């Protein structure tokens, strides 16, 4: 996460630069994004505090062509009407991590293009997230191989954008999660959608897992229909309302599941 700084609202890039200690006009970051009406606009990032970029259309999409190493795929955040684009499998993992983060309310892909005021260097972050407390977060995936050539120039741009707009900035790398946790997230993410939520089933499942036990055993103890109860239990695990050891491969017939109260008792 990068540090944040005071947010200027004057709308004058020269005034902003003079008020920021040691900040020249060329160091001001500009943002290109779509207005609510769909018009492409460009402003200093310091003016974007009240812009709901998580609701805006992308300013960029990957071009697909034969022989390209990266892929273009899509992720639908739970409760969102629009899919978020992912240019690579690494970006897909970053989207899954955002979905899993309880701080994140919603997010979208590629809604803003950042550039220096003097026109030198541009970058489109992978994701823009709105947090539950109203703050904003930029998420970018760390490039690998030949794609990392411009990375030393991108990082200062992201850092400055975060400070001037008051955004968090996170760099997602594969090392952020263990292999087992990444695979568990991939498998359980299919149960993320709110349509699987059921208050009565949740009550019975919490009671069943008040003592740690394997998933299938606890589901059977609820007396609920097996298939629907399994789906609802997986949903609660994804939402982290039921706990598992994410760093071990999750096997429903063997892996222990418990409630937060049970986890305290185990400790």
What is each PLM-predicted segment?
Residues 1-267:
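Electrostatic, structured charged patches in enzyme active sites and in nucleic-acid/phosphate-binding
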């Amino acid at each position: 996460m990068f540090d944040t700084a005071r947010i200027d609202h004057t709308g004058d890039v020269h005034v902003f630069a003079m008020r920021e200690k040691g900040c020249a006009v060329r160091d001001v970051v500009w943002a290109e994004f779509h207005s609510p009406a769909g018009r492409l606009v460009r402003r200093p990032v310091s003016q974007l505090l009240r812009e709901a970029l998580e609701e805006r259309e992308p300013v960029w999409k990957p071009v697909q062509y034969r022989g390209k190493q990266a892929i273009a795929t899509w992720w639908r955040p739970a409760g969102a009407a629009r899919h978020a684009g992912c240019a690579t499998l690494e970006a897909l993992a970053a989207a899954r991590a955002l979905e899993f983060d309880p701080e994140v309310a919603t997010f979208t892909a590629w809604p803003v293009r950042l550039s220096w005021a003097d026109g030198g260097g541009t970058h489109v972050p992978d994701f823009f997230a709105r947090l539950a407390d109203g703050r904003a977060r930029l998420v970018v995936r760390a490039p690998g191989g030949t794609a990392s050539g411009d990375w030393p120039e991108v990082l200062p741009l992201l850092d400055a954008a975060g400070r001037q707009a008051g955004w968090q900035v996170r760099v997602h790398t594969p090392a952020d999660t263990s292999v087992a946790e990444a695979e568990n997230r991939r498998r359980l993410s299919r149960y993320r959608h709110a349509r699987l939520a059921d208050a009565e089933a949740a009550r019975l499942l919490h009671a069943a897992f008040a003592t740690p036990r394997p998933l299938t055993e606890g589901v059977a103890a609820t007396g609920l229909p097996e298939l629907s109860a399994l789906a609802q239990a997986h949903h609660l695990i994804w939402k982290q309302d039921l706990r598992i050891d994410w760093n071990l491969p999750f096997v429903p017939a063997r892996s222990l599941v418990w409630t937060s109260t049970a986890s305290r008792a185990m400790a």
